[in-house]
Amino acid sequence: MMQVFSTELAEREGIYGAVIIQRLAYVIMKRKSSENHKEGYAEHKYWYTTGIMGLLRDLPYISYVHIRGTIDGLVSRGLLQKIVFKQTKERGRRPNWYTFTADGWRMLYEFHII
């Protein structure tokens, strides 16, 4: 798999931040534009439903610690919103749901990600 990121965004958010932000933006925008608009849609927002382990599978070259720290930092700085929405049928698995806040969407536009 080939992945790219904005170097300007990486200057501000670090390489891990840029890669994770662009991965989340890609999945959320893909859901928004898909024919099945209801997938990942709740509370009038599109979400990326995954856990840290899911992101680790998507981004195997970034460690668990770096993914967790980057996500927590983006949430604490108000760029991402994170919730545990509902329990799934998979043995009580409760994935996190992520979406961008208004500041996060502004950042995506500012850096021409979307």
Regions found by a protein language model. Give the residues of each.
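Short coil turns linking two alpha-helices in DNA-binding domains
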Residues: 62-67
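Minor-groove-contacting beta-hairpin "wing" of winged helix-turn-helix DNA-binding domains
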Residues: 87-100
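Basic side chains
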Residues: 23, 68, 82, 93-94
